[in-house]
A protein has these predicted regions:
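N-terminal alpha-helical targeting/anchoring segments
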Residues: 1-162, 180
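TRNA-recognition modules of translation machinery and tRNA-sensing kinases, especially anticodon-binding
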Residues: 70, 157-471
Length: 471
């Protein structure tokens, strides 16, 4: 039964010792004891999060952990016996006691064979244990709402009152009329859910990137330009399943490594800290990265695919932090404040939501979403999110820290906590700015776009067409 569950878990997690020759990360260090001692909570938590694991998987981890401890104890006993019989061999040789030496050597051979058997059995159980445990999602913050997306709790609202929904404010129609958006050429060149930003829309993207960067840097985040490609094992360690059909990541063909186009700059930013040990006094570490996000599933959700709202590639500014275990909850509130500051400066209505269990994915302990009002869509739309992943990613990426070093007594290492949040998802922000900022004359004819003056210092060139109004 354990082996069958492990095979199923390996198919979900895509972890196998056969990957070892090309791997850059050691095997994940998961807390099996915590899982085994909290089977009821872990099972309920997985159900609340709609985790794609077998109903008996967590109980199976507890059973496998018991088996692991039993074999480990037997193996340690045999290793102690090997040491003792080795001492007897040396003593009998010194005393020229040939019969005693021969008996001890025969016993040593038996012990050697038993150790080899136990080591093989332990390795098999450990692989089963790891494969099962990797499929278990993170714990959940006690304040997180239970249920689907509709159960999200509004924590705060910001900006002006939402203007009435109307199709005249559709961002695609506005973009086409003002020469800002070319979906037809993109469909010819690449396909559906790709786009060209032209004229002032291209300048708007650059202004938004630099504006978000400036706010993050002002709050102590170090700027980073990230790779857009990562190894699959790094992607998996961050909590994503790049070979899972639901994720539909883009994979690079014709390479000797299993490389993936990143769905978020969170992945290369997290990878920066892999296999490193930090001093606790040097934490938190805060970086802000600019990268391109690639999402192969863009065409999967009906009306969300309209225009710029859900696309295959977009520019994204990402916040990432590594903290001690005690710092992460405060860091989440600090990062929320930064995100709120960025969105408040853009002048459209938005709200902050505490996301429910079914929206947390595998890695998040708690997640906030920020949604902007988009009157052309007639709905609120996510423009930012923030997740505290506690030690979920750190245990897989081996991000650790230690306390003060004592002479002759090196302090033990502890797995760090990681947090990630969107500073700016550019196409979604452009949707919100166009749909809220469009201006019309008395006959409801489009006359231009009102943009927040906070972007003006980051604007390259002049508004040659004269339809931008800075407010």
């Amino acid at each position: 039964m354990l082996r069958a569950l492990a095979r199923s878990a390996r198919r979900q997690c895509r972890f196998s010792s056969s990957d070892a020759p090309n791997r850059v990360l050691p095997a994940p260090r998961l807390d099996y004891r915590h899982i085994a001692e909290n089977v009821v909570y872990k099972t309920t938590n997985a159900q609340n999060r709609k985790a794609p694991i077998d109903h008996d998987a967590i109980q199976s981890v507890a059973r496998a952990y018991t088996e692991f401890k039993t074999i480990s104890s037997a193996l340690n006993s045999q290793r102690n016996a090997r040491s003792a019989v080795g001492e007897r061999i040396r003593h009998s040789a010194k005393e020229n006691d040939a019969p005693a030496k021969e008996a001890a050597m025969a016993e040593a051979l038996t012990i050697k064979e038993e150790i080899a058997r136990l080591e093989a059995e332990l390795a098999s159980v450990e692989e089963t244990l790891l494969s099962l445990a990797l499929a278990i999602p993170n714990d959940t913050h006690p304040s997180s709402p239970l249920g689907p997306e509709s159960a999200a709790v509004e924590l705060s609202s910001h900006g002006p009152n939402p203007i009435p929904a109307t199709p005249t404010r559709d961002h695609v129609a506005i973009g086409r009329q003002l020469g800002l958006l070319d979906l037809e050429s993109a469909a010819t060149v690449t396909g559906n859910s790709w786009y060209y930003l032209t004229n002032e829309a291209a300048l708007l993207e650059m202004a938004l990137v630099n504006y978000a960067l400036s706010v993050a840097i002002r709050h102590g985040f170090i700027p980073v330009m990230t790779p857009d490609v990562a190894r699959s094992e790094i992607v998996r360690a961050c909590g994503f399943q790049p070979r899972d059909h639901a994720d539909q990541a883009y994979h690079l063909a014709g390479t000797s490594q299993d490389l993936v186009l990143c769905g978020t700059a969170e992945i290369p930013l997290a990878g920066m800290f892999a296999n490193k040990i930090y001093q606790d006094t040097g934490l938190p570490l805060k970086v802000v990265g600019v990268g391109h996000a690639f999402r192969a599933e863009a065409g999967a959700r009906g009306k969300d695919t309209h225009g710029l709202y859900r696309v295959h590639q977009f520019t994204k500014v990402e916040l990432f932090a590594v903290t001690t275990q005690e710092q992460s909850e405060k860091m989440m509130e600090d990062m929320t404040s930064i995100q709120t500051s960025i969105l408040s400066g853009l002048g459209f209505p938005f709200r902050v939501l505490d996301m429910p269990t079914e929206e947390l994915g595998a890695s998040a302990y708690r997640k906030y979403d920020m949604e902007a009002w988009m009157p052309g869509r007639g709905a609120w739309g996510e423009v930012s999110s923030l997740s505290n992943c506690t030690d979920f990613q750190a245990r897989r990426l081996h991000i650790r820290y230690r306390g003060a070093v004592q002479p002759d007594h090196p302090s033990p290492t502890t797995f760090a906590h990681t947090l990630n949040g969107t500073a700016a998802a550019i196409p979604r922000l452009i949707v919100a700015l166009l749909e809220n900022g469009a201006t019309f004359d008395d006959e409801e004819k489009l006359t231009g776009i009102a943009l927040p003056s906070i972007l003006r210092p980051f604007w390259v060139g002049a508004d040659t067409k004269g339809y931008i109004q800075w407010q």
